[in-house]
Amino acid sequence: MKLSYFYVAADVPDGIIPESSVVIDVLRATTTIAWALENGADSVQVFADVDELKNQAKTFDSKEKILVGERGGKKLDGFDLGNSPLGVSPESVKGKRVFMSTTNGTRSLHRVRESKSLYTMALPNRKAIAERLKSDNPKEVWIVGSGWEGSYSLEDSLAAGALASLLMDQLESVQIVNDELMASVALWKNWENDVEGCLRIASHGQRLAGIGNHDDDFACCASLDNLSVIPKQIEMGVLRSN
């Protein structure tokens, strides 16, 4: 199994459809996706464009949908929830389609939407995704970070390194293909005993801290291997627990 890591959507090669892709946005889109599905959401549909999201959402009854979105870490006007994993409680999302648009994560999902198998991962469901990849046994896996407005993010690279490290520990056949992932594994080894500390010193972590008290979000996003949910794309742009 060959593993590659791309810091942001723009780094993903053109003209190639990977066998398997894993998209990461630790703070906070893929953590929110994992918790929404864990808490009983029927599905999560992701959009890079807010107007497209609103048009699609109009086709659903109000009782069958919930709108989740943020820009710059703040809830979008007219949306039900911002991009917090704590907001997608069972009372809010159970049985509903979550229509979601965020600053960074939804762009990366859009970029690799044609992958043969597409998953989303956060630190809470790292082990579950690793187990699924072991079961699928693809020849090649692209791990795609989300970054911040097109630039590198520490926390996504930490999670990429966490996934690769776990797979390397469990499979002799794993090959790390690029330096980006090798550096991410080293980053994980350095911070694996203080995951929340890494999230807090990251520039996006500092950005979140600067716009309000996000202590509970940090704790949730830093939790490791406590969810068994596996968000998988079942149709273009639509994720469901698989």
Swiss-Prot record:
InterPro entries registered for this protein in UniProt: ComB-like (IPR005238), ComB-like_sf (IPR036702)
UniProt superkingdom: Bacteria
Catalytic activity: (2R)-O-phospho-3-sulfolactate + H2O = (2R)-3-sulfolactate + phosphate
EC category: hydrolase
Keyword S-adenosyl-L-methionine appears in the UniProt entry: no
EC number: 3.1.3.71
One function term, GO molecular function aspect: 2-phosphosulfolactate phosphatase activity
Pfam families, per the entry: 2-ph_phosp
Cofactor(s), names only, from the UniProt record: Mg(2+)
Keywords (A to Z) from UniProt: Hydrolase, Magnesium
Family: Belongs to the ComB family.
Listed name of the protein: Probable 2-phosphosulfolactate phosphatase
Higher taxonomy: Bacteria, Bacillati, Cyanobacteriota, Cyanophyceae, Synechococcales
Gene coding for it: comB
